[in-house]
A protein has these predicted regions:
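Divalent metal-coordination and catalytic microenvironments
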Residues: 4, 18, 60, 72, ...
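C-terminal cap of metal-dependent C-N hydrolases
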Residues: 89-103, 108, 113-118, 122, ...
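Short, glycine-/Ser/Thr-/acidic-enriched flexible segments
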Residues: 9-11, 30-33, 72-76, 89-91, ...
């Protein structure tokens, strides 16, 4: 399956092409907030308007793109709940929801979980083994003290530290 990794800055006219061509957009969700690297290195080089066109997850989803998440570890954290929470809050995981970055592009918790599990397994040709909780499929379990689906988005990134 064709995949574009680090699909962070996509032109409007190219968004529907992901679905048309069956290309998976692999995105690293921990970059979906305005971090110091973005402010200091990226924004000054590409400009504010173009910078705010990065990580348009909601727009890509509306255009029919299949999105799968990856950790980008060791460059970013390997903690899955942070990676699942950031595209929902669009905020720095260390600060909670203080200054969401282009919040109109935020995902729901269910969408973020799906991109990190089911769609990631599909991208890896492992959907028959992983990705959803079904009889006969393998799973790695993480015990949490609360239900991520019932938590405010800002709390998701705090569930595992």
């Amino acid at each position: 399956r064709p995949v574009i990794v680090h699909a962070q800055l996509i032109r409007d006219e190219d968004m529907p092409r992901f679905a048309q061509l069956g290309v998976i957009a692999n995105i690293q969700p921990l970059w979906c907030y305005l971090d110091p690297m973005n402010k200091e290195l990226i924004a000054p080089r590409i400009g504010s308007e173009r910078n705010n066109q990065q990580y348009r997850l909601r727009s890509m989803l509306k255009a029919g793109a299949m999105i799968a998440f990856g950790s980008d570890w060791p460059v970013t954290s390997h903690v899955p709940m942070q990676a699942i929470g950031v595209p929902v809050t669009r905020s720095n995981p260390a600060d909670g929801v203080t200054h969401p970055w282009v919040f109109k592009e935020a995902l729901t918790m269910d969408e973020s979980l799906t991109f990190y599990t089911k769609n990631a397994a599909y991208q890896l040709f492992r959907e028959d083994e992983y990705g959803v909780l079904e009889v006969g499929k393998r799973a790695t379990f993480l015990v949490l003290d609360s239900d991520p689906a019932q938590n405010p988005a800002a709390k998701i990134i705090e569930l595992v530290s």
